[in-house]
Amino acid sequence: QDARQIERMIEGRHGLMTLMAYELGKLGGMAKEETPYDAEVAGDAASNLSALASVLSPELFPKGSAVGEAEDSEALPAIWEKPDDFAQKISDMEEAAAKMQAAAGTDLASLQGAMRDLGAGCGSCHETYRQKD
């Protein structure tokens, strides 16, 4: 892939992560009881998150897009050193987002339980495959 294609992939994954963080912020605020629980808002945010998670793919991380290889990248080389584990973590994220979609609009306790799993999935991938700020 050429430099421009790689740059577009990085922009795409940054945009995707930004949108996911936006929806997670709504859910996290409710889970932490910083904002009132609203089943409709939670359900919509979880549906959006699940749809976004389904777009997340190892294809958004082409070779040549690691930290030090491409501008604005936070992707660690471990992504390409352990591609099967990376792909599994993405799959786990999709599964956790689907569980959140099923739980979020039910009640606060269900949202909180799903949020723990979702947060653990996000953290696990970022800990291993994303450069710390």
UniProtKB/Swiss-Prot annotation:
GO molecular function, one term: heme binding
Cellular-component GO terms for this entry: periplasmic space
PTM annotation, UniProt: Binds 1 heme c group covalently per subunit.
SUPFAM superfamilies reported in the protein's UniProt record: Cytochromes
Organism, as annotated: Cereibacter sphaeroides
The protein's name in its UniProt record: Cytochrome c-554
Compartment(s) where it occurs, according to its Swiss-Prot or TrEMBL record: Periplasm
Gene (name only): cycF
Function statement: Monoheme c-type cytochrome, that is particularly expressed when cells generate energy via aerobic respiration.
